[in-house]
Amino acid sequence: MADSSRGTYWITTFGCQMNKADSERMAGILESMGYCAGSGEDQADLVLYNTCTIRDNAEQKVYSYLGRQARRKRDNPALTLVVAGCVAQQEGESLLRRVPELDLVMGPQHANRLDTLLSQVEAGQQVVATDDHHILEDITTARRDSSLCAWVNVIYGCNERCTYCVVPSVRGQEQSRLPQAIRLEMEGLAASGYKEITLLGQNIDAYGRDLPGITPEGRRQNTLTDLLHHVHDVKGIERIRFATSHPRYFTERLIEACAELPKVCEHFHVPFQSGDDELLKAMARGYTTARYRRIVEQIRKLMPDAAISADAIVGFPGETDAQFRRTLELVDEIGFDLLNTAAYSPRPNTPAADWPDQVEEHVKVERLKELNALVERKAKACSQRYLGRVEEVLAEGINPKDNTQLMGRTRTNRLTFFPAGSHRVGDTVPVRIEQVRAFSLSGSAQAQPALVR
């Protein structure tokens, strides 16, 4: 447990899994400095917002939170106020003009330098750190939110230039960690009792493009496929997942490896964004709907029970009703287990934000509503296949609504509830599924020999 010689801290995280992983590392740094986790942001001595700028509503929420803490700091000058993440990177110095009470503004490439930057704050400086920074040698020990499941960053940044996306400008160019370093981190996690690892990257299929080495066959020596083989035999790790994938780089070789390696879970998150080829071209996504359908076909051919989740955008500039209907058709055809949906939000410094044919907000709202209704219907249909089956569930915690139940996830990432009985958090339990909902399952624990996959 961290000591409290410097007081308490509170971190609020907005956005993606990458941000959550960064927040865990920053929490680890703060505890190594002598801070301890507080009970709430309004009581903490240091408040840090790890921000997201992927959509405008997330960004505006940050400013609302900041306004409250700025008022608090005017009454309590000893409060340390930090903005990290993508809004910090995007806005930089202008954040200080908007919120002069801030002590530190730091982009995501500087998350592992939090201790160094705070030492400058303690010396009386108001600090902005948004310059490009090579981060791979700066990996720090994280304070994990879970004691069983951990994120492991394998590649930072993104070299894609999707016309709607601000990520490359705020997270920088791709930087891949060495396979040996990733394996070493996983071995340390296994020694600490972790059972499930999710390998993380903004565009994880691009892993290794910046690393040297060519095989005799002429392909890159370090790919995500090679990495999965390299880390698969880490003792103690029972499950391996990875996210987020890009259809342009999602290869048949990768799919075959996932089918062959028993620890790799049968769950794939592969965003498609639109079901219309003209819009995909305008988005600069680099693939067609036919290519996306082939990926799904290959996954289901080798892993018939695999779960497939994705992301989709409605209301992209120029989207016609006919083009939106093609997105609905794709969703209806594939039947995603989960689909993260969003109305297009113009982001600063992206080409699509300046295009003249912006879709009206009320049209976006109606399209999003229609898509979400279809998503729920298809998810309910997907859930039916689990009824009566026995699924392997890693018990991650106690059901907050019923403390007699444990909850965890199947290998296909379905949230599942079951009576605890003699089982405890951390057990891997065969559960017979007796009730299905759109996005969760319920059942009862079975004797170990009943486990089938």
Swiss-Prot record:
Subcellular location: Cytoplasm
Cofactor mode of binding and number, as noted: Binds 2 [4Fe-4S] clusters. One cluster is coordinated with 3 cysteines and an exchangeable S-adenosyl-L-methionine.
Segments forming domain Radical SAM core: 144-381
Keyword Nuclease carried by entry: no
Enzyme Commission number: 2.8.4.3
Residues of the MTTase N-terminal domain: 7-123
InterPro entries tied to this protein: Elp3/MiaA/NifB-like_rSAM (IPR006638), Methylthiotransferase (IPR005839), Methylthiotransferase_CS (IPR020612), Methylthiotransferase_N (IPR013848), Methylthiotransferase_N_sf (IPR038135), MiaB_methiolase (IPR006463), rSAM (IPR007197), rSAM_horseshoe (IPR023404)
Pfam family, one: Radical_SAM
Keyword terms: 4Fe-4S, Cytoplasm, Iron, Iron-sulfur, Metal-binding, S-adenosyl-L-methionine, Transferase, tRNA processing
GO MF annotations in UniProt: 4 iron, 4 sulfur cluster binding; metal ion binding; methylthiotransferase activity
All residue ranges annotated as the TRAM domain in the record: 384-447
GO terms for biological process, alphabetical: tRNA methylthiolation
Listed cofactors: [4Fe-4S] cluster
Gene Ontology terms: cellular component: cytoplasm
Residues reported in the UniProt entry to bind [4Fe-4S] cluster 1: C16, C52, C86
Catalytically driven reaction(s): N(6)-dimethylallyladenosine(37) in tRNA + (sulfur carrier)-SH + AH2 + 2 S-adenosyl-L-methionine = 2-methylsulfanyl-N(6)-dimethylallyladenosine(37) in tRNA + (sulfur carrier)-H + 5'-deoxyadenosine + L-methionine + A + S-adenosyl-L-homocysteine + 2 H(+)
Binding of [4Fe-4S] cluster 2, residues: C158, C162, C165
Domain of life: Bacteria
HAMAP family tied to this protein: tRNA_metthiotr_MiaB
Biological function: Catalyzes the methylthiolation of N6-(dimethylallyl)adenosine (i(6)A), leading to the formation of 2-methylthio-N6-(dimethylallyl)adenosine (ms(2)i(6)A) at position 37 in tRNAs that read codons beginning with uridine.
Entry's family note: Belongs to the methylthiotransferase family. MiaB subfamily.
Subunit: Monomer.
The protein's name: tRNA-2-methylthio-N(6)-dimethylallyladenosine synthase
